[in-house]
Every structure is written in C-alpha cells, then in structure tokens.
C-alpha cells in the first residue's frame, strides 16, 4: 500500500475538534500508511493531541486556519468570506497537491461551492453530487446519489449522476455490471417529473449503463438496485428519514422493557433477543457508513455528517482513503469520455424545461 495524505477540516461539524481530532488519531492507528493534515486553530487542536504517541505525531501536521465557516451560513456568503477558513484551506491543500483528499463535516452548501470553485468539475459534468453507499437487506450495498448537493436537478444532471454512480458501484463497491434505477413516485413510465422521465429515456440508450427503470422509496433497502439516482432534495430527505427510523429502532432494542420487574428467565430471554436483534441490524447503524463523497470533481472530497461522533468521522476518513486508492475521479473521467457522444448530446434540447409531474 502506498502512502497517502488527507487534509481534514477539523473545525467543521457540530462538535469540531473534540470529535475530529480523536477520530484522526483513531484513523492513524488503523492505517500505518496514512498521513493527516489537521486544518484549524492550533491552540484548540494541540491539547487534543496529548495522548498521541511519537509514531502518530510523525504522521500528523497542524495547518493553521484563521476562521471557521458556520454551519448556518448561507453558501454564497460563506464562499465570499471563505479565505483563511479551515474548509477552504483544506480544499486548497488538495488543489495544490499537498493532500490527495479533503474530509469535512462543515456546511454542505459551502463545501459544494468551494470544491467546485477550487477543484473544478470533470469534463462533461455540470455539478458534483453527494453519494453514499448504504447496506441493504440482501447483505449487499446500494450506491445512492444525490444526497443534497443539488436541490433541483434537470435530466442531464440525473444522467450524469447515473453514470458516476455506476462507476463507483463497479470500481469501489466491486459490483460487476451494476443495476441503475431512478427514484420515482411509481414504477409506471408515465409517473414523475419531466426531468426523471427524460433522463429515463436517455439512460435506455446508453449501453454502458445497466438501467432497470424506476424504484420507489420503500424499496431503498431491498437490494433491487445497485445504484439509485435522485435529485438532492429528495435524496437528502429520504436518507435522513431512513437514518432516523434506524436510530429509533436500535435505541428501542436497547431500552425495551427497562425498569419493569420480570422473572429471571424472562429477563434472560429479553437480553438474548436484544443482543441477537442488535447484531442482526447493527449494519444499518448510520455511523457505520458515514461519509458522502462529492462525486464529479477533479479531486476527492468527503462530506461527513455534521453531527458525526468520533467513530463516524473515522469512517468518513476511511471513505476518503478508499476513494483515493480506487482512483474514483480518474475512472469516472474515463467512463464519461466513452459515453458522452451517446448520451449527453441527446439532452441538449431538454435544458430549460420547467419541471412537471403526473
């Protein structure tokens, strides 16, 4: 394994360095070839490195930043005032070649805008998309995008997302000839927004994409598709709803019946069932798949949940490692060159259409 360097915006997220710095040390323990650039306020970061040993410190470097982009800042305002911020400095390290990827739990809109400004989209890509890999009930994984980078998407963008998601499923997840579906309100051809139906028509003509049609939200975790494509608004709401339900379910398993008097054999049975069910469904815990890749850029950027704990942020760092090792941007660029003439030009006359649904 070759050595690689990641830039971490350790000031971003709900908990900032109190979570991101310990997560960085955890990641260093798990990967001996990893070097981390911790971008933020040195006075805040340094005390949190007190437990780091000599070997860990040799693979750490603090990069000073003057400010932090607030999580509630408007993206346009945040970008204008971003110079010297931990997020921007981390992205600039990638642009300059000092780091191979950036990980941030900060403001999503600002991260999207700055990444597009500094790293530039791949040729043939209008806007990047946030993508994650979710576990499903068949013990496999489903690639889902967009998760919030683009609230409104036209048909061209949906087709681009489908191609990028297909490459990610094949090259990173390891699914040969991955099935691709569009998220819709029904499986019938006449259902949904014009943008979805127009994208569907084009995807049917692209031989390198194994397009299977529409999928409804209640089938997200069934394993019926390997790649699920949607606009950012729908994807974000869908993902957060699913995560909320899963967290509630797992917490109920732990707390069910607490405080009530039971006979000893009922208590043993309850504990056995709780452990068994928790093991069975623990793979659905959102902490285990934290980290959405901003796909479609000339560099690698991973967006962590703002509310991520130490374990979850460490997972996001590992996502960045995998994306760099699998050369995701380069592989997407190669695939785009092969399909561009067959797909994207067919959508030129679709631009400017107003959304309509049935």
Curated annotation (Swiss-Prot):
SUPFAM superfamilies for this protein: Isocitrate/Isopropylmalate dehydrogenase-like (SSF53659)
Bridged cysteine pairs (disulfide): none
Gene Ontology, cellular component aspect: cytoplasm
Catalytic activity line of the entry: a fatty acyl-[ACP] + phosphate = an acyl phosphate + holo-[ACP]
EC code: 2.3.1.274
GO biological process, one term: fatty acid biosynthetic process
Keywords of this entry: Cytoplasm, Lipid biosynthesis, Lipid metabolism, Phospholipid biosynthesis, Phospholipid metabolism, Transferase
Locations listed in the record: Cytoplasm
Organism superkingdom: Bacteria
Record-level Gene Ontology MF annotations: phosphate:acyl-[acyl carrier protein] acyltransferase activity
Pathway the protein acts in: Lipid metabolism; phospholipid metabolism
Record-linked PANTHER family: FATTY ACID/PHOSPHOLIPID SYNTHESIS PROTEIN PLSX, PHOSPHATE ACYLTRANSFERASE
Function: Catalyzes the reversible formation of acyl-phosphate (acyl-PO(4)) from acyl-[acyl-carrier-protein] (acyl-ACP). This enzyme utilizes acyl-ACP as fatty acyl donor, but not acyl-CoA.
Quaternary structure and partners: Homodimer. Probably interacts with PlsY.
Family as reported in the entry's similarity comment: Belongs to the PlsX family.
Name this polypeptide is given: Phosphate acyltransferase
Organism: Escherichia fergusonii (strain ATCC 35469 / DSM 13698 / CCUG 18766 / IAM 14443 / JCM 21226 / LMG 7866 / NBRC 102419 / NCTC 12128 / CDC 0568-73)
């Amino acid at each position: 394994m070759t050595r690689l360097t990641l830039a971490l915006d350790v000031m971003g997220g709900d908990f900032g360095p109190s979570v991101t710095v310990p997560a960085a040390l955890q990641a260093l323990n798990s990967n001996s070839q990893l070097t981390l650039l911790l971008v933020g306020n040195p006075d805040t970061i340094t005390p949190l490195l007190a437990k780091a040993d000599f070997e860990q410190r040799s693979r750490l470097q603090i990069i000073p930043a003057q400010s932090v982009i607030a999580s509630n800042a408007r993206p346009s305002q945040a970008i204008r005032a971003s110079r010297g911020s931990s997020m921007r400095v981390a992205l600039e390290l990638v642009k300059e070649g000092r780091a191979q990827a950036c990980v941030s739990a900060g403001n999503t809109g600002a991260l999207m805008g700055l990444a597009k400004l500094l790293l530039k989209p791949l040729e043939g890509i209008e806007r990047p998309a946030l993508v994650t890999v979710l576990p499903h009930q068949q013990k496999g994984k489903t690639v889902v995008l967009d998760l919030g980078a683009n609230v409104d998407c036209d048909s061209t963008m949906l087709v681009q997302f489908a191609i990028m998601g297909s490459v990610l499923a094949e090259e990173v997840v390891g699914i040969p000839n991955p099935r691709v579906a569009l998220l819709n309100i029904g499986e019938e051809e006449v259902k949904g927004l014009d943008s979805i139906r127009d994208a569907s028509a084009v995807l049917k003509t692209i031989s390198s994409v194994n397009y299977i049609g529409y999928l409804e939200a209640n089938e997200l975790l069934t394993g019926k598709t390997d790649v699920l494509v949607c606009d950012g608004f729908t994807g974000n709401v869908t993902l957060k709803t699913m995560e909320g339900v899963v967290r509630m379910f797992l917490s109920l398993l732990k707390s069910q019946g607490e405080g009530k008097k039971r006979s000893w054999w009922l208590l043993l049975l309850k504990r056995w069932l709780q452990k068994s069910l928790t093991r069975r469904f623990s793979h659905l815990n959102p902490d285990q798949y934290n980290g959405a890749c901003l796909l479609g850029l000339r560099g690698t950027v991973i967006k962590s949940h703002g509310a991520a704990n130490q374990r979850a942020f460490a997972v996001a760092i590992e996502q960045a490692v995998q994306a760099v090792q699998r050369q995701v941007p380069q592989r997407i660029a190669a695939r785009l060159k092969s399909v561009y003439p067959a797909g994207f030009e067919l959508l030129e006359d679709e631009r400017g259409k107003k959304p309509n649904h049935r």
